[in-house]
UniProtKB/Swiss-Prot annotation:
Chain intervals for the UniProt region annotation (Disordered): 108-141
Gene that encodes it: LPE10
One GO biological process term: mitochondrial magnesium ion transmembrane transport
Protein name (database record): Mitochondrial inner membrane magnesium transporter LPE10
UniProt superkingdom: Eukaryota
Membrane topology: Multi-pass membrane protein
InterPro entries: MRS2-like
GO MF annotations, alphabetized: magnesium ion transmembrane transporter activity
Keyword terms of this UniProt record: Ion transport, Magnesium, Membrane, Mitochondrion, Mitochondrion inner membrane, Transit peptide, Transmembrane, Transmembrane helix, Transport
Residue ranges of coiled coil: none
Cellular compartments annotated: Mitochondrion inner membrane
Length: 453
């Protein structure tokens, strides 16, 4: 509390502050060195743990997590983490080959770093008894920053989806990136990279990844494809998985769209139109995705050199000759790719039909809404016509009811004459207006041509 004397004498007559008031302000603003010391120590620990977390995040990105199948279709390694430099050296790759593969650090490392930094910050802040309140207030921004980094990492991993497919051929391997499949195919190994690192979709992505690994293992163990090289078996297994997923997604979109269109046939409301808009966006995204996959296979089929380079086993067996495979004798891989290219092309055609259905539905909805709008406008014009006719009758009656002398009052039957005249004028104007409205309502192409002439 400021004393009464200082509160009274704080402002002098000349407009300056008094000395007692200045001393009071200096006393209030005097810093507490013990409190600042504790706060600085907490900031140092917080910055130190943040730097450690960033260093750990950088180190986690140097590892590649993958599952490896051998030539017999058996999974010899599952979820193994390998240094990226060792992986590149082992399979004769280049660092630019991994630009398409956006590696994310694991969720376990993130939670461990956050928990360790928060626990150490709590221990440091509880070291002194006088800084308990400051430690609680300081730990809240720490937890907020951890939560923000956690949400940003999960958001980045969930939205980090490469929509551009790619099949890259190297000297002794094939790099495949189609949908959520990122794989490396060798002459005797199939390597599937694990890129599921989202907290929100961890269960769904892990289940999908396990199903993919199971399907690929069964496909590689199939005895019906013993005549094909291993790289063709692996590539066909990946294409089968991709096509089945595309076909399933296409059926889901088709079912949802047909239900929406059926509902719009009964009634048109705001919610159904919103569902139609959302489904239209999803179908457009799906169409763009499968079109890119189709173009990827088409470009591969049109290049004979790349088709020859797909024979990894043959190049490995004849590596001592030093002669690359040439010519157009690549019927096996060409027939394999053409089969799935045609299947994907059929899916593209079906999706284009769905887009045409959406376009037709939108046009019909616009026509119906325009027709309803025209009906409302005509109804408003009819009411306006009736009010106009009634206004003429009211005008005549108003003239007759004025408090002025006129000859009609002296004539017998003047009231009847005014009533009949106003009624006739009302009916005549109403009939004329209705006739003009009918002409406006019955607009045809021939009438438009007549008006132009």
């Amino acid at each position: 509390m400021i004393p009464i004397r200082s509160s009274i004498t704080r402002i002098l007559p000349n407009g300056f502050l008094s000395k007692p008031f200045l001393r009071q302000l200096n006393k209030k603003s005097k810093p507490n060195p013990h409190k600042n010391k504790n706060f600085d120590s907490f900031n140092e620990v917080f910055i130190h743990k943040t730097l450690l977390s960033s260093i750990k995040q950088h180190n986690d990105t140097d590892y590649v997590r993958c599952s490896i199948f051998n030539a017999n279709g058996d999974m010899i390694q599952h979820g193994k983490e390998i240094l990226k430099s060792q992986f590149i050296k082992r399979y004769n790759l280049t660092p630019r080959d991994f630009r398409k593969f956006n590696w994310q650090r694991s969720a376990t490392g993130t939670t461990t770093t956050s928990s360790s930094s928060s626990s150490s910050a709590g221990q440091t802040s509880s070291g002194t008894s006088k800084s308990s309140s400051s430690s609680s207030s300081s730990s809240s921004p720490h937890s907020t920053i951890s939560a923000l980094s956690l949400s940003n990492s999960s958001l980045g991993s969930s939205t980090n989806v490469d929509i551009v497919p790619n099949i890259t051929i190297r000297r002794n391997s094939i790099l495949v990136q189609l949908l959520n499949i990122r794989a490396l195919i060798n002459h005797d190994q199939l390597i599937i990279f694990d890129n599921s690192s989202s907290f929100q979709n961890s269960h769904v992505s892990s289940y999908t990844h396990s199903q993919c690994l199971k399907d690929l293992s069964q496909r590689l163990k199939s005895t019906n494809l013993d005549g094909l090289p291993f790289e063709f078996k692996a590539l066909e297994g990946i294409l089968i998985y991709i096509v089945s997923n595309l076909n399933m997604e296409m059926k889901v979109h088709n079912t949802v769209l047909q239900n929406i269109i059926t509902g719009l046939e009964d009634s048109i409301d705001r919610n159904k139109l919103r569902y139609l808009l959302i489904e239209s966006k999803k179908i457009h995204q799906f169409h763009r995705k499968i079109t890119l996959i189709k173009n990827c296979l088409e470009d591969l089929l049109e290049n004979d050199d790349e088709l020859n380079d797909l024979y990894i086993t043959e190049k490995f067996n004849s590596e001592g000759d030093g002669q690359p495979r040439q010519g157009t004798n690549h019927e096996e891989i060409e027939m394999l790719l053409e089969n799935y290219y045609q299947t994907i092309d059929e899916i593209v055609q079906i999706v284009e039909n769905l887009k045409n259905q959406i376009k037709t539905t939108e046009d019909l909805i616009n026509v119906v809404l325009d027709s309803n709008r025209n009906q409302l406008m005509l109804l408003g014009l009819k009411f306006s016509t009736g009010l106009l006719s009634m206004g003429v009758a009211l005008y005549v009656s108003a003239l007759y009811g004025m408090n002025l002398e006129n000859f009609i009052e002296e004539i017998d039957g003047g009231f009847e004459v005014v009533t009949v005249v106003s009624t006739i004028a009302l009916i005549a104007l109403l009939l004329f207006s209705v006739k003009q409205l009918k002409k406006v309502e019955k607009v045809t192409m021939t009438s438009l041509n007549d008006q132009r002439k």
